[in-house]
A protein has these predicted regions:
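Detector for the c-type heme attachment site
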Residues: 57-61
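Oxidative protein folding and maturation machinery
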Residues: 148-198
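Non-catalytic, surface beta->alpha helical segment in thiol-disulfide oxidoreductase systems
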Residues: 99-143
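Short active-site neighborhood of thiol/selenol oxidoreductases, capturing the structured segment around
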Residues: 40-53
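Thiol-based oxidoreductase modules, predominantly thioredoxin-like and allied folds used
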Residues: 22-28, 48-50, 62-89, 98, ...
């Protein structure tokens, strides 16, 4: 009997340590999570789901429990999950215009939207979901810098290269805004031509 108790305890502890490796979703209200994000200096991450969303369930079962997800999200975010069809999830869905599931909201501690990711972010275990998140963050920062007016050649090269991978629609807009003012001669210079030839 004592042996069975020890084995049960070891299995329980092993299960807990595995569970703690993944993303720690806290049972907090939206306002409590914002307050905690502010006091910890982190941003808020919301997994927006519905009960009938298959990809949402897949992410919860196979991706968020991964150690690398836990290491990244637990360090940088206060993480919560909200059903967008009940409770305060309804108001969150309206406020942040959530219409596709899953949607992942990254919120500043003042409640403003930092950025969001939609269903295209669903990963297979062999994919790197954390890297996808980092890519979207980098793109959001580049978008902000472009909107602020940065048209430096080195920045534009980095921005356009990123858009080629992340957002083809926005790429066309940016090329339309930045290339014509250069004129044909400058546009044909190797460093500029390399931006648009792909």
């Amino acid at each position: 009997m004592k042996f069975i108790s020890i084995i049960s305890l070891l299995l329980f502890l092993a299960g807990n340590s595995i569970a703690q490796e993944g993303t720690n979703f806290e049972n907090l209200t939206f306002q409590e999570a914002l307050a905690k994000a502010k006091t910890t200096g982190k941003k808020l991450f919301i997994d927006c789901y519905t009960k009938t969303c298959g990809p949402c369930k897949y992410m919860v079962k196979f991706i968020f429990p991964l150690k690398e997800c836990g290491e990244y999200f637990n360090k940088n975010y206060i993480c919560i999950m909200k059903d967008m069809q009940e409770g305060e999830g309804i108001a969150i869905a309206q406020k942040y215009n959530v219409q596709i599931y899953p949607t992942y909201l990254f919120i500043n501690h003042d409640g403003s939207l930092y950025f969001n990711m939609y269903v295209v972010a669903v990963s297979k275990p062999e994919d790197d979901f954390v890297q996808k998140v980092k890519n979207v963050i980098e793109q959001a920062e580049l978008d902000k810098e472009y909107t602020a007016g940065n048209r430096d050649q080195a920045f534009l090269k980095k921005y356009i290269t990123s858009l080629q991978k992340q957002n083809k629609r926005k790429l066309q807009i940016v090329l339309g805004e930045t290339m014509p003012p250069m004129g044909v001669k400058k546009l044909c210079e190797p460093e500029n031509w390399s931006l648009i030839k792909t």
